[in-house]
Amino acid sequence: MYAINYKTLIVQALGFKPTADQQHAIDTFAEFLADRDDHATMLLRGSAGTGKTTLSGAIVRTMLALKQRVVLLAPTGRAAKVFALNSGVPASTIHRRIYRQQSLGGAFSLAPNMMTDTLFLVDESSMIANEGLRESVFGTGCLLDDLVQFVYSGRNCRLVLIGDKAQLPPVGEEESPALSSAFISGYGLTVYESDLREVLRQSQQSGILYNATVIRQMITHDEAIALPKIRFSGFPDIVCVPGDELIETLATSYSQVGMDETMVVTRSNKRANIYNQGIRNQVLWREEELTSGDWLMVVKNSYYWTEQKKAEDTSAPAFIANGDRVVIQRVRNRRDLYGFHFVDLWLQFPDYDNYELQVTALTDTLATEAPALTREQSQQLFDEVMADYADVRTKPERYKRLKADPYYNALQIKYAYAVTCHKAQGGQWAHVYVDQGYMTDEMLTPDYIHWLYTAFTRATEKLFLVNWPKTQTEE
């Protein structure tokens, strides 16, 4: 099919006259599809309010209308769910698509790409890391390397990476490698790229997007010497919440849009802990440590519990990912062992079609300031559980018993009413509360600007800025 047909059909699927930036992206996409080179790829970069999501959906619908195969991927379960809702096509996480487990309890190797003539579209690509993770059980430990290798090992398969360079880059990286044409061309790929910068007219009426654009411009111009001033006047979708009104306002959000559509975003685990305790005690009136209906976040990848379920249910996810949100259905059998606290939980996974799973969880991580068990705590748990198998003669057999031990594999969890921005990234909620903590002009860094932009753009309907200082308010 000629490139011109793709252009016409995508514009029709869009349903309105594209902006100049969108038209350029459509033209570039058509050229990318027309290129006969097996190693062509495309980067579609765009910030909040520029119509990137709308354009991505139009591209997906056009490809399907032309009976072309598409696969939609995202780095997290929540991001995949958002991508699927915006495009009308199921999406999955990158890990679930490209890796498969060699054996029970074993590492995950790169799966063969059995698809042919398929376009792989990956949303929220700014989150894709390529720093080799020590002790990673996934492929090479470099997710971007593995993704590129997987896609291009399939006959006539291609990759489109979609994302926002203004968002936080992956932890430990200066920029998002998946959105860098220089980095991607290093794989020997021919890179087509397009940037959406022009904010759509309807987006300019949104206080969230107006202010996000002001913040983004501070990133791109590299001249930020003062903290951004936020405009509240004239925008009903962005409000300042004094601390003494927070409990009542949060309770209103929970009743209006529900817990699944409300999120508090903070700058540290310590601050998130304070919020989580306060919300449970003063908004939800929960006294027990864990109760039915509690929202939790998994804070360390876990393979053990899904393996147990796989034997009887082949639709079970391959693993539970760090960052997955779950809802408690039942709580049973609290006990103390090895110097730690454990509990049996029946969990529901809203981002995975409400999949249900029974696990043993470790509750010591609920209130700690560390992201998960500290190295010292992990070593203590290892030593204590290993001591139980002291009578087992050989070291390999002791390790085998350890890997099959439910307490050593207990799920590490935190409350999920308030999270850090890295944990919120990839997700969107109707009501988002942002607490940046104490800030001065001297504390201004590029990382803070990326943080603030990412936090602002998690909200789809209303943004609440908690204890926002007058010095950062536009007069």
Regions found by a protein language model. Give the residues of each.
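Conserved helicase motor core of P-loop NTPases
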Residues: 6, 25-29, 37, 152-157, ...
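Conserved SAM-binding loop
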Residues: 18, 72, 264
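Short, conserved phosphate/pyrophosphate- and ester-handling motifs at nucleotide-, phospho-/glycolipid
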Residues: 22, 76, 268, 426
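ASCE P-loop NTPase helicase motor core
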Residues: 27, 31, 36, 40-224
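C-terminal accessory regions
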Residues: 337-475
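Short, solvent-exposed amphipathic alpha-helical segments in soluble enzyme
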Residues: 88, 279-283, 449-453
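Conserved pre-motif I regulatory segment
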Residues: 2-40
